[in-house]
Amino acid sequence: MGASVALTFLLLLATFRAGSGHDEVETRECIYYNANWELEKTNQSGVERLVEGKKDKRLHCYASWRNNSGFIELVKKGCWLDDFNCYDRQECIAKEENPQVFFCCCEGNYCNKKFTHLPEVETFDPKPQPSASVLNILIYSLLPIVGLSMAILLAFWMYRHRKPSYGHVEINEDPGLPPPSPLVGLKPLQLLDIKARGRFGCVWKARLLNEYVAVKIFPVQDKQSWQCEKEIFTTPGMKHENLLEFIAAEKRGSNLEMELWLITAFHDKGSLTDYLKGNLVSWNELCHITETMARGLAYLHEDVPRCKGEGHKPAIAHRDFKSKNVLLRNDLTAILADFGLAVRFEPGKPPGDTHGQVGTRRYMAPEVLEGAINFQRDSFLRIDMYAMGLVLWEIVSRCTAADGPVDEYLLPFEEEIGQHPSLEDLQEVVVHKKIRPVFKDHWLKHPGLAQLCVTIEECWDHDAEARLSAGCVEERISQIRKSVNGTTSDCLVSIVTSVTNVDLPPKESSI
């Protein structure tokens, strides 16, 4: 009797401890497998253990595989964190009809050891056929109504398609997504952490199967910006080594909880602004960043009649060009991003929303600050070139090539009017006083930087028509790099007068 009571007490105590421990931490053990273990330098198989300290988070196991003509090719197995699609599933069952990659998840230790594919089958409930007399009555009764409805729908369709292409996008409109990428809808797509916040939303680093991607999430009230950026990305000819790679556009949720996603390539080094804040650049790095940045903007501005078999690529103005919207690859190649304010110039079509004062205030050209814009294609391209001049100055300010100190990173005009200038501050400095960021004296003693400073001045010229084109800037930087790197460090002439003897590409703009 005493032994029985003691055993009961011990069982109750163990149950209490297990229950209290479950409130604090949950543990999940899953079968682990990685088909790309050699490339990712991980184990090929085994057991994965996941511990979560938050009580409201549930832990799951998952499996993903391909079916190649009946041959099952396992892709990955492992632990998965808090997905409502996995709740209360004891077995790992994929229900999609015929995806490119099958995915299933479940709850319970080692529940992903076995996995199956059971597509959902639609049930069909046959109903008795109506008699011939009833059928005739229905046909003769409904035929006029159907005909009238079709006439009304046709008239409405014709009316809508006579409106300009770039009208305001109402929240209940669904303009349709671009042709789906092979990656759209594939699981697992897992948001990892926020990398940036901007005017129209936030950018997440996410994992899509075996690669990292960037997911830009717009709230539903910014649908117009999402729609604009999606249309720019899906314009023919937008695949270029110096433009951000587009993967997919998706809608998540419904009604007021709807989120609008843009999925693009992820670049771990982040923006040019972030890189310059924490790093100095050498002469060769400066040349590589500036030349590839100019190449990307030149291609964006270019009108290509027939681009790589994709159709006509129109000229596109960025309208928010700044160092924050220039990303860097690992080799410091520049990538242009954030086309939420961009505008296309297609022959015979209105350019859409060409409201003058858009973009980031600090990078606005004098004519934008004055509100005196000529709403033509060339005017918008020249506004981008003014902003490029400021970004070039930012890069030069962090270059170690000159024989002198390198200051801490500053935004354009930060030294003159601080970090948060008003529109009136910029109008006074940029428009009325015609002030531009300062060139340090020791920059002008380096032959390459001195020539680049001349190019910068011709980018931010107060007279918009006198500004260089992006293609001319690319060509100039290429020639400057070759002229400087073609001499030895012992033979570099460090006086400004020597710079004036170098033939630069003509100032004539191709805009």
Curated annotation (Swiss-Prot):
Q: Which Gene Ontology cellular-component terms appear in the entry?
A: activin receptor complex; plasma membrane
Chemical reaction(s) catalysed? L-threonyl-[receptor-protein] + ATP = O-phospho-L-threonyl-[receptor-protein] + ADP + H(+); L-seryl-[receptor-protein] + ATP = O-phospho-L-seryl-[receptor-protein] + ADP + H(+)
Question: TM segments?
Answer: 137-157
Known EC number(s)?
A: 2.7.11.30
* Residues annotated as the enzyme's active site: 320 (proton acceptor)
Keyword annotations for this protein, in alphabetical order, are:
ATP-binding, Disulfide bond, Glycoprotein, Kinase, Membrane, Nucleotide-binding, Receptor, Serine/threonine-protein kinase, Signal, Transferase, Transmembrane, Transmembrane helix
Q: Per UniProt, what is the membrane topology?
A: Single-pass type I membrane protein
Which residues, if any, are the signal sequence?
A: 1-20
Primary enzyme class:
transferase
* Cytoplasmic topological domain residue ranges: 158-511
Q: What are the protein's GO molecular function terms?
A: activin binding; activin receptor activity; ATP binding
Question: In its UniProt entry, what is this protein called?
Answer: Activin receptor type-2B
Pfam entry (one):
Activin_recp
Q: Which organism is it from?
A: Xenopus laevis (African clawed frog)
Question: What family, per the record?
Answer: Belongs to the protein kinase superfamily. TKL Ser/Thr protein kinase family. TGFB receptor subfamily.
Q: Where does it live in the cell? A: Membrane
Sum up the protein's function in the record's words.
Answer: Receptor for activin A, activin B and inhibin A. Involved in transmembrane signaling.
